[in-house]
Amino acid sequence: MRDFNNIQITRLKVRQNAVFEKLDLEFKDGLSAISGASGVGKSVLIASLLGAFGLKESNASNIEVELIAPFLDTEEYGIFREDEHEPLVISVIKKEKTRYFLNQTSLSKNTLKALLKGLIKRLSNDRFSQNELNDILMLSLLDGYIQNKNKAFSPLLDALETKFTRLEKLERERRSLEDKKRFQKDLEERLNFEKMKLERLDLKEDEYERLLEQKKLLSSKEKLNDKIALALDVLENTHKITHALESVGHSAEFLKSALLEAGALLEKEQAKLEECERLDIEKVLEKLGMLSGIIKDYGSIAHAKERLGHVKNELHNLKEIDHHCETYHKEIERLKTECLKLCEEISGFRKEYLAGFNALLSAKAKDLLLKSPSLVLEEAPMSEKGAQKLVLHLQNSQLETLSSGEYSRLRLAFMLLEMEFLKDFKGVLVLDEMDSNLSGEESLAVSKALETLSSHSQIFAISHQVHIPAVAKNHILVFKENHKSLAKTLNNEERVLEIARMIGGSENIESAISFAKEKLKV
């Protein structure tokens, strides 16, 4: 295995789907070609692989994929690895419902897709809905090309991204202030009412508990008064008990201390009750009701105090709102000027290097037997990437009218540029029938492009022609035996026979084998 940081799928196991009763394949890095007669289950195999990543519905009772992804951060999902090169295992079990697991940790399908997002890049017939060849990608490629040519370009892009992000934040804050300004009078009235409601209460941390205690005392003060008075009367004569104990030679110090403490506690409670005599029960209940409402509205007295501070701050800010708006306006205008200047500098670089990039794109397209495409810079609303967009021109064609084969080859041309200048794709390429309906010459061109891409990414490609299997590092054959679909990785001798079958079927088998050996260089 090559020592690189890209994802690599090392194994696929499938149990009981519509085609395969049992499937167990091990994969190596590089290009893996998948071939076989029509209807044996090649696309079903690819669908099972995509199903493990949540990109298709699971088509089997059990799918298991082993992969190595050193850069993937799994700790956030409770999956810890001692070694980042330790294989991860995705399991998909389908019974009444479909369940997803990563290293035996259960995850929802959406969570799994979010974690593995971007690890699988697929070229298929629904490519236009994916909008892969968009102006963001093309502009990123041009910028990557310029960065490779001129080191002064990257600082400009970084500075623009930082300043534009700050500009957007300030504009959002200014809009929020302006909204407040439009409703300033109404907002001030509501905040002042809330401030008055909170300030007229004594928002002490223990105030609610203190009032509850007062309510309890008031409701039972007469009974408590009688009990305390009776107890204090009894304590008046306890000296007779302690004197008698001392007379017969026993110490009464402990009892004296306890009786003194009991007397002090009762006198303290009696003082509380006397204080209650001065309380207005209606006012206590009224304030208690208000505090209950505050706790219900704000969660606690502490939260109400925090809210009071926030309300006061908001009222202060409303008084300063005109000043703040003016400050925001000046800062926004300053940042706009700086961003526009950076956009002009970036635009200058793009115009200078566009011809060279177009020449490179044309060369890639020519290698893939396509008419030369060209990219044209047009003005666009300012963003963190500048104030331009790239528009793809295809001589006498429109992108939407390209055949599936033409589009796939054009996408390959851009992939080759991505590999060279962006180097940020660390996933696996899955190509579904890439060479179907292509001429032999076109298929040969595609195989060369895939061979180049496979030095950077693992690739799985269903193939109907000999050129992709001939350059593939691994060749997987899907076939039927006793009416059951099977799949296996071919050795060199088996590869020769399969490529010979693809060339000429059962006719001219000797010349087909000779040609297959020549293609495989064996």
Swiss-Prot record:
Keywords: ATP-binding, DNA damage, DNA repair, Nucleotide-binding. It comes from the Bacteria. ATP binds at residues 36-43. One of its GO terms (biological process) is DNA recombination. May be involved in recombinational repair of damaged DNA. Belongs to the RecN family. This is DNA repair protein RecN. The lineage of its organism: Bacteria, Pseudomonadati, Campylobacterota, Epsilonproteobacteria, Campylobacterales.
